[in-house]
């Protein structure tokens, strides 16, 4: 399994990876947890995207480190200002978490963004945790990794997995790629907590990663079709304004013109319209004023959801 992953990451990121630089884990979260435990302690600082995957902040706080949010900006298609990130770096910064494509916004960092981030970090003793779990779900352009920036392979912990690319969520299979000395310590954390990733799921993972990839291409095309339809529909609804996400399978509309806070609106849409969305505030302080919808559903159901949201807004706004 580790050899298959090493071959795939070497090919897709344009770097040389060996099997002793790969740690296989049951899902992506253990890599987030172990990386933060390994690199940050009380008094240290970790910079992370906000709004972002809630586990980042909770894991940082669990380790006793200080969580330093970097705001994803709607006007920049939910990328962040690299100068703002640089201003957060201090002599206590141990780790910077990047996520592209992003959950919940669908934002994608550009190749230039990654090179600018690398330049801002410079020669400081700071590691990067690059969450690339949606790497195969980029709709415009090509996925790029900070691991591919010259000089940054040894400073990057790459997180990827099978849940999103191969729709294998329940199989619980993810992996981290990092320099071999750090991989040995992360493996020790894995061994003493989860023992191992189930062997039969690893066999399935090998088949997925080495097999025919046409299903991945078809799924990406279908997600793009659903994204296009759902964003267009939301932008026709009173109070909603939605940018076109460039990756993942979420849309993240701005709902400030509805006059509602995100949590009450999400609750009302669920209870009164039968449409499930997550409050943007669930993803951090800078997520207020937004909702997250998933397009991992049929186009028929997504169109039905749009109709229900539209009817609810006409009645309540």
Q: Where does each model-flagged region fall?
A:
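Generic hydrophobic, aliphatic-rich segments that mediate packing or membrane embedding
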Residues: 1, 5, 28-31
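PLP-dependent class I/II
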Residues: 11-317
